[in-house]
């Protein structure tokens, strides 16, 4: 079984979605079940409703699952596993207070050495009746694993101390809950971000202590860097939020296409998730950081906009008039996102606001002169744009750019865009909506 294990503590990050996509693809390729595990044991950081938001985003991206579990419902199992390790003398109670440990950390910082927990501290404050934590005994050997992307990774004994499994309130730590659940659900491969590399040896040690004979294969994805700063994309960067991208008018299909593409060798530029399942290979992923490029994502989104069928296009733009489909297709050629497309069609159909938009009084006057001329014309009476244009010029007595710029603005709401002869048939059929001015 493969899994994706998000925490409901904030908006889904593009790095998390990328991991979800890759786990889903490999599960499909290997004909294995796919598990979604909501890691909700951190009650203080959980945000109500974020779990459902995550699931909705996954559905939008075309990702389905065979099993959905909430980690918090396995706490009794986690405590049972901790008790097992205590009985087998693989774990121990530690009574050291938070204050004591903070003092030791400060001392290490002042002495410019890494902090390392010492087992001899475990019973120092036992007589003070502190609630104890449970710690796994530190290894006396190196921990190594063969990462599918990073290749051989090794941690020396001095890099791993006796770390906490259960907190004072008997709640499991992230690494303990994660390792226990991966055993419970027989997870065979984990694809996740490289920020988890330091967690991996701890989870391996926990599983070994619990008697696991089926080592998990790990693949740690390189981080995604910001295209301008070159720094790791933070959750605070709005562009790193999947929700933000969707709200900006990026199609789920384009986001999936892009996240599979970056840092990867792909056989074609534009593809679907189902197509990627046919050829995706972890071996083709680069071990170097990927750079997020919003401009290229917009390009891919433009290509996916063109692939939308008529029904889906009308649904997304919230338009029921099928007679506008041809116009939408023309506008798509100039748009990178749904938001841009919606704006173009809205400007076309809504009353034009020349008073608020343009400061030049002479220009506004020309617009009004032309508007009155156009209002007197029967749009349906003209066989083509050329004959319509000549009559409008005659009636308004305007010519050159004094005519064409006001004309485009009055008919489309934009000072530039698709050639007017191409959209004239749609202007004719919708002229009563098109030719309106805001009061």
From Swiss-Prot:
<feature type="binding site">
    <location>
        <position position="235"/>
    </location>
    <ligand>
        <name>ATP</name>
    </ligand>
</feature>
<dbReference type="GO" id="GO:0006424">
    <property type="term" value="P:glutamyl-tRNA aminoacylation"/>
</dbReference>
<comment type="function">
    <text>Catalyzes the attachment of glutamate to tRNA(Glu) in a two-step reaction: glutamate is first activated by ATP to form Glu-AMP and then transferred to the acceptor end of tRNA(Glu).</text>
</comment>
<comment type="subunit">
    <text>Monomer.</text>
</comment>
<dbReference type="GO" id="GO:0004818">
    <property type="term" value="F:glutamate-tRNA ligase activity"/>
</dbReference>
<dbReference type="GO" id="GO:0000049">
    <property type="term" value="F:tRNA binding"/>
</dbReference>
<keyword id="KW-0030">Aminoacyl-tRNA synthetase</keyword>
<keyword id="KW-0436">Ligase</keyword>
<dbReference type="InterPro" id="IPR004527">
    <property type="entry name" value="Glu-tRNA-ligase_bac/mito"/>
</dbReference>
<dbReference type="Pfam" id="PF19269">
    <property type="entry name" value="Anticodon_2"/>
</dbReference>
<keyword id="KW-0648">Protein biosynthesis</keyword>
<comment type="similarity">
    <text>Belongs to the class-I aminoacyl-tRNA synthetase family. Glutamate--tRNA ligase type 1 subfamily.</text>
</comment>
<dbReference type="InterPro" id="IPR001412">
    <property type="entry name" value="aa-tRNA-synth_I_CS"/>
</dbReference>
<dbReference type="Pfam" id="PF00749">
    <property type="entry name" value="tRNA-synt_1c"/>
</dbReference>
<dbReference type="GO" id="GO:0005829">
    <property type="term" value="C:cytosol"/>
</dbReference>
<dbReference type="InterPro" id="IPR045462">
    <property type="entry name" value="aa-tRNA-synth_I_cd-bd"/>
</dbReference>
<dbReference type="InterPro" id="IPR008925">
    <property type="entry name" value="aa_tRNA-synth_I_cd-bd_sf"/>
</dbReference>
<dbReference type="InterPro" id="IPR014729">
    <property type="entry name" value="Rossmann-like_a/b/a_fold"/>
</dbReference>
<dbReference type="GO" id="GO:0005524">
    <property type="term" value="F:ATP binding"/>
</dbReference>
<dbReference type="InterPro" id="IPR000924">
    <property type="entry name" value="Glu/Gln-tRNA-synth"/>
</dbReference>
<keyword id="KW-0067">ATP-binding</keyword>
<keyword id="KW-0547">Nucleotide-binding</keyword>
<feature type="short sequence motif" description="'KMSKS' region">
    <location>
        <begin position="232"/>
        <end position="236"/>
    </location>
</feature>
<protein>
    <recommendedName>
        <fullName>Glutamate--tRNA ligase 2</fullName>
        <ecNumber>6.1.1.17</ecNumber>
    </recommendedName>
</protein>
<keyword id="KW-0963">Cytoplasm</keyword>
<feature type="short sequence motif" description="'HIGH' region">
    <location>
        <begin position="6"/>
        <end position="16"/>
    </location>
</feature>
<dbReference type="InterPro" id="IPR020058">
    <property type="entry name" value="Glu/Gln-tRNA-synth_Ib_cat-dom"/>
</dbReference>
<dbReference type="InterPro" id="IPR020751">
    <property type="entry name" value="aa-tRNA-synth_I_codon-bd_sub2"/>
</dbReference>
<dbReference type="InterPro" id="IPR049940">
    <property type="entry name" value="GluQ/Sye"/>
</dbReference>
């Amino acid at each position: 079984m493969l899994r994706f294990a998000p925490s409901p503590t904030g908006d889904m990050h593009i790095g998390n979605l990328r991991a979800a996509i890759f786990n889903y693809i490999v599960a499909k390729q290997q004909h294995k079940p796919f598990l979604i595990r909501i890691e909700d044991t951190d009650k203080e950081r959980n945000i109500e409703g974020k779990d459902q938001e995550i699931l909705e985003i996954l559905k939008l991206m075309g990702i389905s699952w065979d099993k959905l579990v909430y980690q918090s419902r396995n706490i009794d199992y986690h405590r049972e596993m901790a008790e097992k390790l205590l009985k087998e003398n693989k774990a121990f109670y530690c009574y050291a207070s938070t204050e004591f440990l903070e003092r030791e950390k400060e001392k290490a910082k002042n002495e410019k050495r890494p902090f390392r927990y010492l087992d001899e501290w475990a019973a120092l404050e036992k007589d003070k009746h502190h609630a104890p934590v449970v710690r796994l005994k530190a290894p006396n050997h190196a921990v190594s694993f063969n990462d599918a992307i990073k290749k051989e990774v090794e941690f020396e004994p001095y890099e791993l101390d006796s770390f906490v499994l259960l907190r004072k309130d008997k709640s499991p730590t992230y690494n303990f809950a994660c390792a226990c659940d991966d055993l419970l659900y027989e997870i065979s491969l984990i694809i996740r971000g490289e920020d988890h590399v330091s967690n991996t040896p701890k989870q391996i040690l926990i599983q070994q202590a619990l008697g696991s004979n089926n080592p998990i294969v790990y693949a740690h994805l390189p981080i995604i860097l910001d295209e301008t700063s070159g720094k790791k994309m933070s959750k605070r960067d709005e562009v790193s939020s999947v929700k933000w991208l969707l709200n900006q008018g990026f199609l789920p299909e384009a986001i999936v296409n892009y996240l599979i593409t970056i840092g990867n060798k792909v056989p074609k530029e534009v593809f679907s998730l189902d197509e990627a399942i046919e050829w995706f290979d972890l071996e083709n992923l680069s071990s170097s950081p990927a750079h997020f490029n919003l401009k290229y994502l917009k390009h891919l989104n433009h290509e996916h906009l063109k692939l939308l069928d008529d029904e889906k296009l009308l649904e997304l733009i919230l338009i029921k008039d099928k007679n506008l489909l041809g116009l939408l297709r023309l506008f798509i050629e100039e748009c990178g996102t749904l938001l841009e497309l919606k704006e173009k069609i809205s400007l076309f159909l809504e009353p034009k606001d020349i008073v608020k938009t343009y400061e030049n009084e002479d220009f506004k006057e020309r617009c009004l002169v032309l508007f009155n001329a156009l209002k007197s014309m029967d749009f349906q009476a003209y066989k083509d744009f050329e004959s319509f244009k000549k009559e409008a010029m005659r009636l308004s007595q305007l010519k050159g750019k004094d005519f064409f710029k006001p004309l485009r603005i009055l008919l489309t709401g934009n000072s530039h865009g698709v050639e007017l002869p191409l959209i004239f048939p749609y202007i004719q059929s919708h002229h009563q909506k098109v030719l309106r001015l805001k009061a």
